[in-house]
Amino acid sequence: MSDINATRLPAWLVDCPCVGDDVNRLLTRGESLC
């Protein structure tokens, strides 16, 4: 079950604009750190 939830989580974040923006911001920050 956890694997399925983990797979659906990104899609759910993409569906939610507000959360998606936060995630994109974190991903961008992570790429900057790398």
Curated annotation (Swiss-Prot):
Instruction: State which tissues express it.
Output: Expressed in basidiocarps.
Propeptide stretches in the record: 1-10, 18-34
What UniProt keywords are attached to this protein's entry? Answer: Thioether bond, Toxin
Protein modification: Processed by the macrocyclase-peptidase enzyme POPB to yield a toxic cyclic heptapeptide. POPB first removes 10 residues from the N-terminus. Conformational trapping of the remaining peptide forces the enzyme to release this intermediate rather than proceed to macrocyclization. The enzyme rebinds the remaining peptide in a different conformation and catalyzes macrocyclization of the N-terminal 7 residues.
Q: What Gene Ontology terms describe what this protein does at the molecular function level?
A: toxin activity
Source organism superkingdom: Eukaryota
Keyword Transferase (UniProt)? no
What positions does the cross-link Cyclopeptide (Ala-Pro) connect? Answer: 11-17
InterPro entries, A to Z: Amanitin/phalloidin (IPR027582)
For the cross-link 2'-cysteinyl-6'-hydroxytryptophan sulfoxide (Trp-Cys), list the residue numbers. Answer: 12-16
Record keyword Coiled coil present: no
Similarity field: Belongs to the MSDIN fungal toxin family.
- Briefly state the protein's biological role: Toxin that belongs to the bicyclic heptapeptides called phallotoxins. Although structurally related to amatoxins, phallotoxins have a different mode of action, which is the stabilization of F-actin. Phallotoxins are poisonous when administered parenterally, but not orally because of poor absorption.
This protein's name: Phallacidin proprotein 2
